[in-house]
Amino acid sequence: MDQHQIKTRHPLLDEKGRLIEAGYAKELLMDYDRSAIKAGKLRIKEWDYYLIACDDFAVALTIADNSYMGLDSISLIDFRIPWEKTTSPMSAFTMGKRRLPSSSISGNVSSGNKNYNIEFINNEDHRLLNFHMKKFDGHKPISGQIRLECPPSESMVIATPFAEKETAFYYNQKINCMPATGKVEFDGKTFEFKEGESFGVLDWGRGVWTYKNTWYWGSASGQIDKVPFGWNIGYGFGDTSFASENMLFYDNKAHKLGQVTFNIPMKNKKYVTRGGCCGASGIEACTADLIEDYMSPWTFTSDDGRFEMDFVPIIDRASRTDVKLICSDQHQVFGRYSGKAVLDDGTVIRVRDFLGFAEKVFNKW
């Protein structure tokens, strides 16, 4: 596919609140300004999401301002058991009061109350993630401090319009392969993220979304022969004719991919026989209601042959919310990738049991 690369610095939106330039970049070039948005203020969504992982466990932290609703979230995942717990306090009508930074490059953000606090501190060469929650799992508290190093590196940046609404857009940066150190304390245990074994990813998102969306997202960060390596893959919403968000990262350089397809296995939800009894003179009508079988092995294929992977799930961090007008069905599946990825110069990177995740999320929001 032909993809448009953004190469110059300029504002993200024009005077009518429309994207000036759709496409991808390898750094955050366009300037996001919440006050330039012309869509309804309830449609604005902003979030910072961090995932820090090693081979044995992971922690995920979110601070989000979705205008009509603010969300803070802490997840702890233990791949050895496997086990996971997510607790996500929500607040009504935050409407930008959380003041999430207009750039991923600078600015701090914190959110909480007397029961918890999550804080992201952005320094020039590193980031500090501090958090605690008194009642994370029942009455069990959790706390943690993570340091992410920020070496000079390229990243995945994409500006995606929505064909059905000209003032809707999604401006997103994914920063992979940030070396991580730190620890999490929970239930009398210490989960230590050790140097050289632990890596983080930032999902920095700002935009105006349409009401009903489905997205697919996959990510991995680690090392191959002590060289930083990872990827971002995804699709499912908006007008992606300008560019995909699929990208490899090797030795802090980005390598652009074409289209990648998530092949999630399916299974029968139910089997119903209608129309009479079976037999020579009978009529049999069978319906199969197929749903995703998230815990069976997946595959990933690409139109350019540069990302071909098998994926063996470990745990499905699933959650579902349905309160009529607001609905969310999320399946973030952690597992291990095996296969090949091809860099821009044709170098083939082969991976085996490489930790990462892949997810499918449906939202009415």
Question: Which residue stretches match the model-derived regions?
Answer:
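Structured soluble/peripheral alpha/beta segments that form catalytic or ligand/cofactor-binding pockets
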Residues: M1-W365
